[in-house]
Amino acid sequence: MVRAPLPIRDGLGPTRIRMPDASQFRTILDYLVDRFPQDSTRLREKMDLGEIVDASGTPLVAESPIVPRADIYLYRDPPIEPVVPFATPVLHRDENLLVVDKPHFLATMPRGKYIARSALVVLRRELDLPELSPVHRLDRLTAGVLMFTVRREVRRAYQELFADRAVTKVYDAVARYEPSLSLPVTLRSRMIKERGVLRAEEVPGEPNAETFLELSEHDGRHGMYTLHPRTGRTHQLRLHMNSIGIPILGDNFYPEFYDVADDDYSTPLQLLARSIEFRDPFSGEQRRFESNRRLRLPI
């Protein structure tokens, strides 16, 4: 990965923009203003302040000519974002790892309308950890254990644990109780999620998603389910629960999408990343981190 020439600022890294192969624009500024007309005034201000740089970190000026396929870097101005009114407690911190108990509704990474108030940016800023990076991700609507690396040089070793399926993950979910289901069960299917499409879907083909599902308790109407994902596809647990007729309570994506206001925190998705366990790639120690949050059956 190419290292950006600008440092982390206020928890946010710079944005990279690649110039087109060929262009009718004479200067970089002309191209930027045409591509982002709503930001034309701020782009000119950033250029005047030397806040737009090339790949070597050299500030660009208004007359800097376009170089085909060259990369430039600048800091985005974060949009006005909804404040997620829930804390993100630290479960563990050492020289390599930061583990937190993410609340529902908080995005893991800067994305879409959640930039400065994503978990990554907030924690970088509040804990003064500019090299902080997530080892894995949780959906914005999912709560529970979320792990970050503190230092750049250890990032790959921990990320490879997840890529190699060397991490044991346990989730809890609340859904309708269905006595006709034969549980426990291992669910396998092929899932795809196209870029720009909100929902994932199951399609014919070789399975790429696997979840072991068991019922922990029920009250006759709702059940508490324990899920053991053996793969990590986007929305895997939500889609697998829906596929057997018991969508997770509070899921506004499956079986059908319905919109929820950004500031409506009344019905959180009843899905919790309860624990993760793995052998540390540096110390060899078996490590386990567990959420202090708990789901409950509706009264």
Task: Report the location of each language-model feature.
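RNA pseudouridine synthases
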Residues: 1-299
